[in-house]
Amino acid sequence: MSKFEDFRNQYNSFLYKDYSVEYIESAYRIVYHFEIPGLCEFQSKWEFPAKERVDETILKALAFHLGMAETISYWKCACPKQLKILCGTLSAEQKKWWKKLYYNGLGEFMYRNGIVVSKEDLVTIECEDKACAPLHDTQSYDGCLVSVGGGKDSVVSLEV
């Protein structure tokens, strides 16, 4: 049995437990709470300068989804079969999008570690919170948004 399978059997789930957002002296601080049951509980913190306050509904939605992006890095510790979201919800379409991001975004990780798994079997995403209404942005935007994390892929993305 591979390490991948061993870890998945030993640590079946990754919990996105909670997050908090607070405004402190012209900055927003976001604290995330994660857990891999049987392995560890931990926090991740972000702080963003803020020239002005942001609508709380929008801020919470942004913070929640930033936390979803954070789960990908930490999920790699044990590659659990389930991602359980205890502090928010995703629509079926959003779950499909996040599963695709996990699978495609972890391509190099899986290749380097000899992990062979289908997109469907990599991770299931479960939400325990009730569904909430999606946010609708009425503003129009021009240009492209490129995520730059500092790795080789970021340079390639910018060149394309």
Predicted regions and their residues:
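RNA-binding accessory domains that recognize and position tRNA/RNA substrates
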Residues: 1-143, 155, 160
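Short, glycine-rich nucleotide/cofactor-binding loops
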Residues: 145-152
